[in-house]
Amino acid sequence: IAKLTNVSFFPGSEMDRETVLEFGADQVLIATGSSWRADGLGRATHAPIPGIADHAQCFTPDDIMAGQLPSADAVLVYDDDHYYMGGVIAQLLADSGKAVTLVTPGPEVSCWTQNTMEQHRIEKALLDRGVTLIAKHTLSGVASDSVSFACNTTDRALSIEAPGLVMVTLRAPMSSLYFSLAGEAQEQIDELPFGLLRIGDCMAPNTIAAAVYDGHRAAREMDNWPDPDIVPFKREQSVIDRL
């Protein structure tokens, strides 16, 4: 971006509704990203987990990446994301000297990475570091220093002591800026003096590749944003005439 003469870059400049309106842009793209949930809501559990607020040391990947590691020697990582993040967090904690257990509802750790041919290497890296791996178990409850699971196959209960806990579940869009401009029901969009669009994880948390694609597409379509109710590609439509 720094090489482009028609692009101005302002890092460390958090904006709110007033500063966006004052800027005077013709088009505004909101790409404020997402944050990891800490309540246990995930693919396998469609509601927050009871007792999770009572755990003494419950962290998210955002906390870990900010340098906030559990002080406990034993840490449990619950991975209901199934991509690379759960494995990365477990490796980092193991490399920092923690005794790590990784539990996932999936059939194997980081199971989605079968699509990217990384699963075998991720599992080997975890085992080489002494990480305990438990698959096919879904989180059911959290206490102050332990976590309860149910086996996906037998429904048998399993309780694990977990002085430290890291939740790798779902991410929530950070869309407060967008809705402050568009209105809670997006009823104010037509009243704005500029075009408004949210893209990337701010719209729907996804992979890095998907976020890059979304930004690239939005830039290409900026001068003529398509109607969201119209499919922007040709479709095959079979027509059968009566005989």
Describe the residue ranges of each PLM region.
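A Rossmann-like FAD-binding core segment of flavoenzymes
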Residues: 1-38, 60-63, 71-72, 95-185, ...
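Glycine-rich dinucleotide-binding loop and its adjacent helix/turn
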Residues: 3, 9, 17-18, 37-96, ...
